[in-house]
Amino acid sequence: MCGILAVLGVADVSLAKRSRIIELSRRLRHRGPDWSGIHCYQDCYLAHQRLAIVDPTSGDQPLYNEDKSVVVTVNGEIYNHEELKANLKSHKFQTASDCEVIAHLYEEYGEEFVDMLDGMFAFVLLDTRDKSFIAARDAIGICPLYMGWGLDGSVWFSSEMKALSDDCERFISFPPGHLYSSKTGGLRRWYNPPWFSESIPSTPYNPLLLRQSFEKAIIKRLMTDVPFGVLLSGGLDSSLVASVVSRHLAEAKVAAQWGNKLHTFCIGLKGSPDLRAAKEVADYLGTVHHELHFTVQEGIDALEEVIYHVETYDVTTIRASTPMFLMSRKIKSLGVKMVLSGEGSDEIFGGYLYFHKAPNKKEFHEETCRKIKALHLYDCLRANKSTSAWGVEARVPFLDKNFINVAMDIDPEWKMIKRDLGRIEKWVLRNAFDDEEKPYLPKHILYRQKEQFSDGVGYSWIDGLKDHANEHVSDSMMMNASFVYPENTPVTKEAYYYRTIFEKFFPKNAARLTVPGGPSVACSTAKAVEWDAAWSKNLDPSGRAALGVHDAAYEDTLQKSPASANPVLDNGFGPALGESMVKTVASATAV
């Protein structure tokens, strides 16, 4: 991942303004520690902090067309850049960077080229011939992008909020799958897949097609000129990613440079069952496995840094981001700059445990659509910013455009969880990779129950967070929470504690509004809370809040351990809510 900052149409064109923009761009240097660049044209500035993954020697940014009349600063990876270049034979490329193709596509097709890009990206392009500019973000929002407005009428774009929040009074999270054009002065959606309308598909389930499309998504993401690995938790999604990479690594170009032994990484509290599960998968696949550990106190000590980097006060995101943040630092110290991760599968296939209560296929499908549309506010944000904090790039094959189209075109009747038919959550994915002749994974891993990421770190992690928050947030503070924080009022002490840290770094109202809110159970949307009347009384992001679904649900454990406090203030769940919470070690894949 790189860091981009673009400021267009400023009133002040002094050297002091240029210095200020360079200073703000440095706030993104963690995203791109390999090189810095800036292009200034009259009242427009495009700055870049580079993480060199493809073409490390000549791909420094900003990038240009032949006569430098078109300038672009990009954060992303364009997996089909060679195919696109082949259709641009009249153009002369200056670098081997996958991102340079954007400048030349603009010359050929104007603003209508974005849907041709297969990859993850956020970019700003300036046409100096008429001083027009465009900005765009990838289909799902894998790469972060913010847009702001200065008091002088300038328009700002940044990979992270921290580079524009001080100088813009108003700013937003740039919507995924959209393009901004200065010519029209507005945003428009360039990504219009069939599933976006939420109409119910009727295509029969084709396991071979699903498997093949996922393998293609993996293979294209092996495009790298630097060492890479896979985040492996021992859960289904990360294990499938590791398995498919293992099968195809030897034939990939990267193997010639870095060898055909796959490196896998996991992190967790010592003694966690998922450390053993991840090692079992790694041994089965023959990977070079790196098992990393952290303590509850180390996680708590990192909270301020995590919230600063991830730029949210959402409880689930912070719980899950912290181990991923710690792991990314270790990964970078080992010389690895890119990892593949398993985000997105639960949204596409209804893998969260609350989907067991979906009343029919219509509501099941509509909820998956809502979840995918919100990914940029949750798992994409976590995966990108937790890794980018240490200059590591995370690639997410489940969010491949073509794979999503294939998966979301399946009649949702096949995705419904039906225990009487032997269909557990994500059965269509599990079944697609259930190969008796050449197994991808051991059966018990392939059919393992979903464990939510922050749950999987263990109750000793989550309870440690709650205990720490209880020491810093009093009952009287909670009584006044709605007055102190009228926007997205925190309803637990843990949420209140995170909010105080967030406000220290990002005190403006515009920053608060970039974070989602509303009721949720086990990571559901507010709409899905209506599926079970009991859920409205038990709104917690933990997967075990899906009462009557999880093997170690809260209701089962509460019979063994009394609630410790006011349920309004701390969710009412005591510290002994089941040692089985020490599962799904923080591989940062939420699987």
Swiss-Prot record:
Pathway: Amino-acid biosynthesis; L-asparagine biosynthesis; L-asparagine from L-aspartate (L-Gln route): step 1/1
Catalytic activity entry: L-aspartate + L-glutamine + ATP + H2O = L-asparagine + L-glutamate + AMP + diphosphate + H(+)
PANTHER family: ASPARAGINE SYNTHETASE, ASPARAGINE SYNTHETASE [GLUTAMINE-HYDROLYZING]
Keyword vocabulary terms for this entry: Amino-acid biosynthesis, Asparagine biosynthesis, ATP-binding, Glutamine amidotransferase, Ligase, Nucleotide-binding
Organism: Oryza sativa subsp. japonica (Rice)
Active site: C2
Annotated protein name in UniProt: Asparagine synthetase [glutamine-hydrolyzing] 2
Tissues expressing this chain: Expressed in companion cells of leaf sheath vascular bundles, and phloem-parenchyma cells, nucellar projections and nucellar epidermis of dorsal vascular bundles of grains.
